[in-house]
């Protein structure tokens, strides 16, 4: 019973639409009607600006971190990464936003922040290196996911390897429109690097 409650709670935490809430509070807009139409942090940065976008990314990361901590907070015998996966599913398919959410990047990062802080720190550094080199947030996100799989292979944590592999595949799948735009040379590049 407690495991089911924890899974539902993790999903509901992930379902909190940070981008929608911050968009309404900061600018009075629904970010799903602007930019890429996505509820994630990248669209929040593009449509709301750096300050509000930073709040969105922090909120999305926090969702993954909090959900991954639930097994410890609730004293439930379930692997924390499983709770984190349900938060990611909530973020991508949020019940509070008609099941149309983000692309799983920041919330997946939040899962790793709690479970594997060193991986999270190196992942953020790797993301910014890829962003500097490519100027594409989407491509940097996908390449960083691949980095997490390689890293996880060497730390000999089977659960971590399985979860980051599945999350990376999911992140790449969620970016399929971005991949087409990169190939067609229509994907927006970051201008501040």
From Swiss-Prot:
<keyword id="KW-0808">Transferase</keyword>
<feature type="transmembrane region" description="Helical">
    <location>
        <begin position="111"/>
        <end position="131"/>
    </location>
</feature>
<dbReference type="GO" id="GO:0005886">
    <property type="term" value="C:plasma membrane"/>
</dbReference>
<dbReference type="Pfam" id="PF02660">
    <property type="entry name" value="G3P_acyltransf"/>
</dbReference>
<comment type="similarity">
    <text>Belongs to the PlsY family.</text>
</comment>
<keyword id="KW-0812">Transmembrane</keyword>
<keyword id="KW-0472">Membrane</keyword>
<comment type="function">
    <text>Catalyzes the transfer of an acyl group from acyl-phosphate (acyl-PO(4)) to glycerol-3-phosphate (G3P) to form lysophosphatidic acid (LPA). This enzyme utilizes acyl-phosphate as fatty acyl donor, but not acyl-CoA or acyl-ACP.</text>
</comment>
<keyword id="KW-0444">Lipid biosynthesis</keyword>
<feature type="transmembrane region" description="Helical">
    <location>
        <begin position="153"/>
        <end position="173"/>
    </location>
</feature>
<keyword id="KW-1003">Cell membrane</keyword>
<keyword id="KW-0594">Phospholipid biosynthesis</keyword>
<dbReference type="InterPro" id="IPR003811">
    <property type="entry name" value="G3P_acylTferase_PlsY"/>
</dbReference>
<feature type="transmembrane region" description="Helical">
    <location>
        <begin position="2"/>
        <end position="22"/>
    </location>
</feature>
<keyword id="KW-1133">Transmembrane helix</keyword>
<dbReference type="GO" id="GO:0008654">
    <property type="term" value="P:phospholipid biosynthetic process"/>
</dbReference>
<feature type="transmembrane region" description="Helical">
    <location>
        <begin position="54"/>
        <end position="74"/>
    </location>
</feature>
<feature type="transmembrane region" description="Helical">
    <location>
        <begin position="76"/>
        <end position="96"/>
    </location>
</feature>
<comment type="pathway">
    <text>Lipid metabolism; phospholipid metabolism.</text>
</comment>
<keyword id="KW-0443">Lipid metabolism</keyword>
<comment type="subunit">
    <text>Probably interacts with PlsX.</text>
</comment>
<dbReference type="GO" id="GO:0043772">
    <property type="term" value="F:acyl-phosphate glycerol-3-phosphate acyltransferase activity"/>
</dbReference>
<keyword id="KW-1208">Phospholipid metabolism</keyword>
<protein>
    <recommendedName>
        <fullName>Glycerol-3-phosphate acyltransferase</fullName>
        <ecNumber>2.3.1.275</ecNumber>
    </recommendedName>
</protein>
């Amino acid at each position: 019973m407690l495991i089911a409650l924890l899974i539902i709670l993790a999903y509901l935490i992930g379902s909190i639409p940070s981008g929608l809430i911050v968009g309404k509070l900061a600018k009075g807009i629904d970010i799903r009607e602007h930019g890429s139409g996505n509820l994630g942090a990248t669209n929040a940065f593009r449509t709301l600006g750096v300050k509000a976008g930073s709040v969105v990314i922090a909120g999305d990361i926090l969702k993954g971190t909090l959900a991954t901590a639930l097994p410890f907070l609730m004293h439930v015998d379930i692997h924390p990464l499983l709770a984190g996966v349900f938060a990611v599913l909530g973020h991508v398919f949020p019940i509070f936003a008609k099941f149309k959410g983000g692309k799983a990047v920041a919330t997946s990062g939040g899962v790793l922040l709690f479970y594997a802080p060193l991986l999270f720190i190196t992942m953020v550094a790797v993301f910014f290196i890829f962003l500097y080199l490519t100027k594409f947030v989407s491509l940097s996100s996908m390449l960083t996911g691949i980095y997490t799989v390689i890293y996880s292979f060497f730390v000999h944590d089977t659960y971590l390897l399985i979860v980051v592999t599945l999350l990376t595949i999911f992140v790449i799948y969620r970016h399929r429109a971005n991949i087409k735009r990169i190939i067609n040379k229509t994907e927006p590049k970051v201008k501040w690097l």
